[in-house]
Amino acid sequence: MKFAKKYEKYMKGMDEELPGVGLKRLKKLLKKCRSDLQSHENDGSSAGRCPGHCSVCDGSFFPSLLNEMSAVVGCFNEKAKKLLELHLASGFKKYTMWFTSKGHKSHGALIQQGKDLVTYAIINAVAMRKILKKYDKIHYSKQGQEFKAQAQSLHIEILQSPWLCELMAFYMNLRRSKKNNGAMELFGDCSLVFDDDKPTISCNLFDSMRVDISLTCSICLDTVFDPVALSCGHIYCYLCSCSAASVTIVDGLKSAERKSKCPLCRQAGVFPNAVHLDELNMLLSYSCPEYWEKRIQMERVERVRLAKEHWESQCRAFLGM
């Protein structure tokens, strides 16, 4: 079965109607564009690239795909956030959320919803990449790849959503087994693995895409601790991200300047809306308890030192010293 049919069958089989990529409609647009290109060839026009004023490329295909992916990512982020809030809530708040949330009251329902959301995210990411690949093939261009890069900067690349990593960790936390902490399966093809003490969440789906999320901080080169995901999708330790943003742990990342850039992709303005990955933090703490305990002790000392330096500087500034 071709991917387009698999995708259509999957979207129709969902319990509720969610935004998706209109593969059939986009393919029709590309088919029309292919006919236009062939007519240009027959007329003797240059055929090595997409025409400069192609109505399909400039006015229909990319704007349509942009709107659809924005809707998919927005829906995914919203649902993932609600599900994770329900799981992480405590006390009276948790009781209230469980009481008011329909269909989420059983442990099994939470597991299934987490699995469904991860699948929804990845299959839509596959759909976008396949239609962009088809676009480039028809037009002999790299505009599809350029659009994919632009999607990352616009935060509509769903595989870079911090909520995807959190959902995977959430699912593994619910299914955690004390007998096998080395490689905890997600749903057959997804797991947390350690290669030379370097943790990675890996996921295969539909035999066409592999998602690997490195859990090594690129600043301290160690396993991420108290991890945060920036708006661009890159994951760092909280202390490392504060250092990169030139802010104190007291002020936090929300106080970072808009011109501060991600150390990896150099995208600006990605610190203020950083997401704390609490589920991932829990998963790693259970997976490597000895390392985690040592790191907690080190972090506690470092945070006390940084907080002390901050308040001492504030006192000196207040006293005019």
UniProtKB/Swiss-Prot annotation:
Species for this entry: Oryza sativa subsp. indica (Rice)
Record text about domains: The RING-type zinc finger domain mediates binding to an E2 ubiquitin-conjugating enzyme.
Catalytic activities: S-ubiquitinyl-[E2 ubiquitin-conjugating enzyme]-L-cysteine + [acceptor protein]-L-lysine = [E2 ubiquitin-conjugating enzyme]-L-cysteine + N(6)-ubiquitinyl-[acceptor protein]-L-lysine
Domain SPX per the UniProt entry, residue ranges: 1-149
Keyword Oxidoreductase found: no
Protein name in the entry: Probable E3 ubiquitin-protein ligase BAH1-like 1
rRNA-binding recorded as keyword: no
Entry keyword set: Metal-binding, Transferase, Ubl conjugation pathway, Zinc, Zinc-finger
EC number assigned by the record: 2.3.2.27
Zinc finger (RING-type): 217-266
